[in-house]
Structure formats: structure tokens, C-alpha cells
């Protein structure tokens, strides 16, 4: 009993250390490699499209999508290859971009269900088995297309595609290792939960590891009472019985603790700078992540405005509005007075907002910000063609723009709460959207500040005659 208690304490400590390691080092590096894959897949796809070896079947997905939608991996006819592989490669590229923009790479967000999604997405194309003999339909089809491309393309394009394929293999290895480490973490954390809440009344005299059914029934009952809300997995509970009550229990537990030993991977050097261009693009991705939330807020503002307008319209007003509409006479758009708050100083000031113009501006920004993270759109292509100095100026402009919109959204949210009580109950608040958008805008602004800081440091080093490695 004392040995098991000691093991649980050591396991809990090891899990705490591993969680820090996952969130600080392992998972952020996996995200970086997914970004490498986005770039590599885009390079391969664009070259194959330019030479006519793929059909341009851009994957369309719902902007309200909240989870990865896996590309097809089913067999297809030989004559369908350019169309099918073109569609699936496009789908795969879009999903890589989606998880970059909407997934949080930490141990709490990446639960086992999402890990399974990522593993399945990683298997869309088997980059480590990119050969003519692979049994995977998608990989074999893309391999055949690439070989045909090699026989017709110029040396520069061939080199770019070959390099991109190598990047995909290396990135896949890093990502797979990270996901495996995360899976082990979740598995052992669940087994610790089993030990903490399901082993009451069980010991070596009552547990038969070879016939665990009786013990499992008792464990399930204890677990349902002590760990409400958590599912009971008999398979992992059986593993716990072997690790705690079998003849080689001590060896099994020691092996698990060894698995959690600190990695000997080199630590990131202090003071190391990210690539300036990547910093700026990260800022635009953060802004792009606000588009769906701005869209939701816009729909709520439209609903609220229509609700308030209808409630305030007396019979005479309705007659007048009908008269104006019949003769195609434009009505004045509505101006409202709101209170905006500066988040830095908390200073409040009154501001007049034209609701109709505000909605149009919000709709424009939704479309623009969505373009920041939507590959193969004119907005995204223009962004990729800009120099760092131009990106910096544009990021500065749009961060300020988004910051103003957020303040006005918050002000309108408070304004609609002052309407008549019978209408107020139907008003849709936008506080959640405001909070979420603010977080993303803050991230974008940090990227802007990081780039400015790097630029200043480089200038300072140059003045000192020091070259930074």
C-alpha cells in the first residue's frame, strides 16, 4: 500500500513536469512544423497546378466550422487521379491552415479526441512512404503525379518540389513524436485518476489479475461515485490492475517513470529571435482568427438594431415609413451615442456612432480579415507578396482598426442594455465575442511590437558593428 502511494506521488510530480514541457517546448514546436507543412504543401500544389498535372479543385469549407474535417482516403479510378488528388491535396492544405489558426497547441486543448483527429489528418498523405510501392491510395496517386512532373518541369521547380517533400518528412517526424508524447501524458494522467478514485477496498488479496472482472466491477462503482463526469475505460483500468497488483508490478511502474524522464533535447537559446517575416505573418493570422467572431457580433448587432427599431415604431411611424418606402424616399440612418472605454487607461468618453455605417465597416473587415488566413484568395496572395516594411505598416493599420471596432462593439453592447425592459430580455450580447477578439488583437499587436523591437535591436547592433548570429 505504501509503495503504491509513493508511486502515485512520483507519478503526479512527473506528470506536472511533463505538462510544463509539453506546453512550453514540445507542442509549440509541433505547431511550427505544421506551419512548415502548410508552406511545403502550398509550394507542391501550386507547381503541379501551374504545369497542369493537378485539377484546380479548391476545397470550400464552412467559415463557421469548429473542428477538423478529414480529407477522403478512399480508392479512386486511374482516370480520376488529377481531379481527386487535386481536391484532396487542397482539402489537406486547408485543414493544415485551419488548425494553425484555430487549434491551441497545449495539453488541455489537445485532448485524446483531438489527438486522434490530428493523427488521422497526418495520415492523409504518407510522406515517409512517398514511393511507387506505397499501399496508401492518396500517397501513391500524388507520387505518380510528381514523377510525371519531374519529367516535364524545369530544374528550379523540380528542386522546389523535392525540397518541399523533404520538409514534409522531417516535419511529420517532429509532429508524430510530439503527439505520441502527449498521448502518453493523457493515458498516464487518466490512470492516475483511476488510482485516486477507483481502488478503494482493493488489495493483493482481493484482486485476481488473470480474472479481473470482479475487481473491474468494484472499480467502476467507486469511480462513478468519486469521479463524476469522467468516463470509465475498462481497458486502462485493467492496465492499472496489472501495474499495481501483478507479480512484476514494480518493474512496470518503474518503466513508466523512466518514460517521463526529462528529455535531453537542447533548450532554446535565450535571446534567440524569431524570423521577422514569420513574426509579422503570425500577427496577420491572429487578426484573421477574429473574422468569425466579428461576423457573429455583426449578426447580433443587426438583430438587436432591428428589434429596437421595431419596438420603438409607433403606428404613425409605421405609416410614415411605409409612405417613404412607397415613394422610394431614403430615411436618415440612425446615429446613437455610446460610451467607449480605453482599455489601457480605463478613461471613458462619449462617441456618436452611425449604426448603418458601423455595420458596413464591420462587414468589410470580416471579409478582409478572413482573407488574411484563406489561401488562394487575392487578399492572401497580396499579403504574401509584400515586403516586411509594408507588412509592418499594414499590420499597424489593421491592429488599430480592429482595436477601434472592438471598443465600439463594447459600447454598443452597453447601449442595447439600456433599452426598455421588455425588449432588453431579447437583446443578444456580444461580450463573449468582444473578449475573444480582444485576445487575438492583443496577440497581433504583440507581433507588431516584437518586429519593431527586433528592427531596433538590429539597427543598434549595426551601429555597434556587431553581427547577430
From Swiss-Prot:
Entry superkingdom: Bacteria
Protein name: Uncharacterized protein TP_0584
